[in-house]
Amino acid sequence: MKKYYATHLVKSEDLNHHGTLFAARTASWFVESAFIAAACEHGDPSEIVCRNMHGMSFRTPVRNGSVVRFTSRVVHTGSTSLMVHVEVSDELTGQLAVDGYLTFVTVYKETGEKHPHGIVLDEPEDAHEVAEREGAQRLRAGL
């Protein structure tokens, strides 16, 4: 599936008391990035709601002045759900800082009831996408 990107400059107001990127700020950008992927694949943002954040794992601290890239793509589809994998990396070094999965559901905007989206996954582009999809399957097996 297509990758979607969002880039942010980490500023002093984004930091916690340790001088690294605050988890709540990261979570906000993380969900927004995943939402963009789900909404663009579905085609109507008003019909997408977040159901579950399956985890947001910090791999390395993100410091003030860092430029971070959020890379998101749909890695699993159910009849009404879309699971998105998000990776946050340092734009300058490429080092992975954070990753995780979120699930979104398609709903009728008038009633909020779930409805099928009709999205079908394409063939994975590479081994990395295969691994992301396998991670989604492991999460789903544990639900």
Model-identified regions with their sequence ranges:
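Catalytic strand-loop segment that frames the active site of acyl-thioester-processing enzymes
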Residues: 1-23, 127-143
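Active-site-proximal betaalpha loop/short-helix elements
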Residues: 30
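Hydrophobic beta-strand-centered segment that forms part of the acyl-chain substrate-binding groove
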Residues: 21, 35-71, 75-82, 95-101
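HotDog/MaoC-like acyl-thioester-processing domains
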Residues: 63-64, 75-143
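Generic structural detector for well-ordered beta-strands
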Residues: 7-10, 57, 103-105
